[in-house]
Amino acid sequence: MIKIKKGLDLPIAGAPAQVIEDGKPVTQVALIGFDYNGMKPTMEVKVGDRVKCGQLLFTDKKTEGVRYTSPASGVVSAVNRGERRVFQSIVIDIEGDDSEQFAQFSPEELPNLSREQVVENLVGSGEWTALRTRPYSKAPAIDAEPHSIFVTAMDSHPLSADPAVIINEAKADFKNGLVVLGKLTRGKVFVCARAGVNYDLPSGSNAVQEQFDGPHPAGLAGTHIHYLDPVNASKFVWTIGYQDVIAIGRLFTSGRKSVERVVALAGPMVSKPRLLRTRTGASLAQLTEGELKSSDVRLISGSVLGGRNAKGNVSFLGRFANQISCLEEGYKREFMGWLSPGSNKYSLLNIYLSKLNPGKLFNFTTTTNGSERAMVPVGSYEKVMPLDILPTQLLRSLVVGDTEMAQKLGCLELDEEDLSLCTFVCPGKYEYGPILRDSLTRIEKEG
């Protein structure tokens, strides 16, 4: 077991009850372009076309052969683009339950499949896009082979669902998915779990379980990779979420694309925080109808630390999101707030009275408590960074655009979510995730 000491478990109110209930039916789903870094689509459908679940919607110009398929049966109602025609989302009005049929195998046949059979089925169904490379966090090339694969079977995000609850409902599918993933690498398939949790892994496979303990980010793939199989510019690993492993297991044994997704609906503004069974790309406005304490709420697809503001053309559940976080919009300004003793405010530093009550939970809002200012190194980053890197120096290199120094300091190991705590504790209010993404894009482009 690997124990993480540095990090931060955000004391936020509204944690979900770990009980799965059926969510409200939704009539719209969408595939969000921002979920796929560096992807440039070539559309194969247009508004008004009828599609089946699993049918091809578009391919990626930059990664040849990678297919993005429909998460529902219905009619394409919108293809949304932003400035400079950047692809935002493709929306489907759900009608019927028609599905494309893919290759189907019995569980006994899975260990004997070839790598080519596995790749063909994953690519054809669109489940290939559940895999992400590290470095760069992109859909892998079809002919690529990773040094190892990391299954994130734990979640340390604030307000997250317990993966064990979801996996225990689909043990057979999870095992079948691990068998399939094992065909993609000659290395190990690391199943990373919370301390004290033991999953039933398939015998005779290359799947091994590793346990992590400690505060967030103990549950992030970047942390697991750093300690178990570090990457560099010429060494790649792949990551995948536990619910996508279940979906892959179902795909290979049923021949149909699985779009079920269990998410945590949680946060200070949720009337009844709990786990909901819904579908990939579900409309969050429809899913959360009647669930919120007020209308002035920001819906976040994903974690409060690194999720996406779900509004407008992207008001849908993200491809890799396992939670819906709901926070009150922080419009209100507090007169002379910097002079208050802060009994109801939280800070990592010992500057508020609330530190005298360490078990207190807070109703966080979206306010940043101030405007952007200079980056001040007061030791906050070091307190929340468990990786063996120099966070202040790395962040400074990213901010000034020194990609050469950033590579030397370890930026290739990181994804946006790995710097989300640094963003939260930053006195200068910097958003380090987008800054890291810009640097990674430049590094990949320039070599």
Swiss-Prot record:
EC code: 7.2.1.1
HAMAP family in the record: NqrA
Name of the protein in its database record: Na(+)-translocating NADH-quinone reductase subunit A
MF annotations from Gene Ontology: oxidoreductase activity, acting on NAD(P)H, quinone or similar compound as acceptor
Gene Ontology annotations of biological process type: sodium ion transport
Keywords, sorted A to Z: Ion transport, NAD, Sodium, Sodium transport, Translocase, Transport, Ubiquinone
Catalytic activity: a ubiquinone + n Na(+)(in) + NADH + H(+) = a ubiquinol + n Na(+)(out) + NAD(+)
Protein's job: NQR complex catalyzes the reduction of ubiquinone-1 to ubiquinol by two successive reactions, coupled with the transport of Na(+) ions from the cytoplasm to the periplasm. NqrA to NqrE are probably involved in the second step, the conversion of ubisemiquinone to ubiquinol.
InterPro entries noted in UniProt: NqrA, NQRA_2nd, NqrA_C_domain, NQRA_N
Superkingdom per UniProt: Bacteria
Subunit structure: Composed of six subunits; NqrA, NqrB, NqrC, NqrD, NqrE and NqrF.
